[in-house]
């Protein structure tokens, strides 16, 4: 593989373009609409090349792609997207009823959050239980297991499109082994067990290297054995991030927890105190300090209304693990034609009424306890498969032991002290800051779709997975509207970026356009 850095000159270590950090007031959202207007002759020869280069996008290779790509068509009774607890339970229940099942998992390993959460299922760890279910599914001839496979599009008549990474991870592979494969799957029924995505809390300089999602830090430690820092701050508005602090403690690292909520005694708080972990209630990170990486953080004790600070201080740290609660992954449900509704309990959108033969379950449907997700998986898998096979084998619901979490804090963005104005990024991929959203609303944009296009909020390749809800909350606060009145933007396929080679498949070279020889030839 040949890799080159982009959007930097002459190097990442010393980037001349970083001077824009000091000129940020001159580059707000939509500045190019007002700046590059005259002369007209400069539009295509000067202004457009400048803007495109400044956008930081990669350059497509001019070399011929020597890899092999394939397309495949498949049919099944039930397609299950995601192999977390609800996905495994639904696939297992459906397979027991004799249905032809395809289980698709984006990551190399099956299990989802069971690989990282400290839970017990039938006196087994979550990881062991998931491995047991997978080993049983592998023995069933009516089950197809596909890891490294992302279902990225939901189209009419229950047609799903899946992107499989076949050979990317293989060091030695046959020349006939494709790099990637595109699947067109027609399913009689579809279960969307796509889980949820942790969202950040917005604060100053939150794009500094060393700022990570709390769940990512935990997964690095538990799955890959990697510490993201040795002086971590856990900045959270909910209980789930405490599990990351516990994992740091297991690895002989002393974390500090900043909890935006007032002092309370939930199970995880008591456990943290018993472990000797320092907790600061009603605190949050105001600004991350550091140029190439986080070196310290300015933190503050929030007032009752959370609009200012009682006191501030600076503490040393080398990483900030952030958790602003969880957002159900509703992209595929929305693509299917399902209209979303706002759930005030979790402050997020969830699927409403199905338009096609699909059911959304588990965390993707706003159920965040393990007991609920497993029960919904067994129930939905059994019900949908029994309609197809006329069989209804009884499933024993496993006994689950898990930590009970208390209510999260409805708090998404840290205020700033007077005379301080660091960038507070909402969309990390498109560099959309709080100030950009404020400008869009100040200039008369009211529809969330217009705000999206003016600021490019949620228009990057991640489609705003971590930014959309924070952006909606900010628009609702500024406009004095509730989030359902603001609405949400449209989710479109592909859910994740895919290569052009996968889309094209074998239709390359002379196969791209059929040439019919004439009689003369």
Report residues per predicted region:
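Residues forming the flavin
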Residues: 1-18, 25-521
């Amino acid at each position: 593989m040949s890799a080159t850095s982009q959007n930097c000159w002459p190097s990442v270590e010393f980037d001349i373009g970083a001077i824009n950090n000091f000129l940020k007031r001159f580059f707000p959202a939509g500045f190019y609409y007002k700046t590059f207007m005259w002369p007209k002759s400069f539009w295509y020869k000067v202004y457009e090349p400048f803007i495109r280069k400044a956008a930081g996008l990669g350059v497509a290779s001019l070399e011929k792609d020597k890899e092999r790509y394939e397309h495949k068509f498949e049919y099944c009774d039930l397609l299950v997207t995601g192999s977390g607890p609800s996905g495994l339970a639904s696939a297992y229940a459906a397979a027991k009823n004799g249905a032809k099942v395809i289980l698709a998992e984006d990551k190399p390993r099956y299990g989802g959050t069971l690989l990282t959460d400290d839970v017990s299922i039938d006196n087994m760890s979550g990881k062991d239980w998931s491995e047991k279910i997978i080993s049983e599914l592998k023995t069933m001839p009516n089950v197809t297991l596909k890891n490294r496979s992302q279902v990225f599009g939901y189209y009419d008549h229950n047609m799903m499109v899946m992107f499989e990474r076949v050979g990317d991870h293989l060091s030695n592979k046959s020349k006939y082994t494709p790099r990637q494969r595109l699947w067109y799957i027609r399913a009689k029924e579809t279960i969307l067990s796509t889980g949820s995505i942790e969202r950040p809390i917005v604060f100053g300089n939150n794009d500094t290297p060393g700022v990570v999602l709390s769940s990512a830090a935990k997964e690095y430690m538990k799955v890959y054995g990697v510490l993201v820092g040795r002086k971590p701050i856990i900045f959270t508005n909910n209980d789930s991030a405490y599990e990351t602090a516990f994992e740091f403690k297991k690895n002989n690292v002393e974390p500090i927890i900043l909890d935006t909520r007032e002092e309370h005694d939930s199970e995880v708080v008591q456990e943290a105190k018993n472990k000797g972990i320092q907790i600061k209630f009603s605190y949050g990170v105001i600004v991350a300090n550091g140029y190439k990486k986080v070196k310290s953080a300015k933190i503050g004790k929030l007032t009752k209304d959370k609009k200012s600070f009682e006191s501030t201080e600076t503490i040393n740290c080398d990483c900030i693990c952030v958790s602003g609660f969880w957002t159900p992954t509703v992209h595929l449900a929305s693509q299917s034609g399902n209209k979303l509704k706002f759930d005030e309990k979790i402050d997020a959108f969830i699927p409403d009424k199905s338009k096609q033969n699909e059911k959304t379950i588990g965390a993707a449907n706003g159920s965040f306890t393990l007991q609920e997700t497993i029960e919904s998986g067994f129930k939905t898998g059994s019900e949908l498969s029994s309609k197809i096979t006329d069989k209804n084998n009884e499933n024993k619901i496993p006994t689950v032991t898990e930590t009970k979490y208390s209510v999260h804090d409805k708090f998404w963005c840290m205020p700033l002290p007077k005379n301080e104005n660091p960038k507070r990024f909402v969309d990390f991929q498109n560099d959309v800051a709080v100030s950009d959203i404020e400008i869009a609303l100040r200039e008369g944009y009211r529809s969330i779709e217009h705000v999206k296009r003016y600021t490019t909020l949620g228009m990057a390749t991640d489609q705003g997975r971590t930014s959309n809800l924070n952006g909606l909350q900010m628009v609702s606060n500024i406009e004095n509207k509730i989030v359902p009145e603001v609405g949400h933007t449209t989710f479109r396929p592909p859910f994740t970026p895919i290569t052009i080679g996968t889309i094209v498949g074998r239709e390359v070279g002379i196969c791209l356009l059929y040439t019919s020889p004439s009689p003369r030839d």
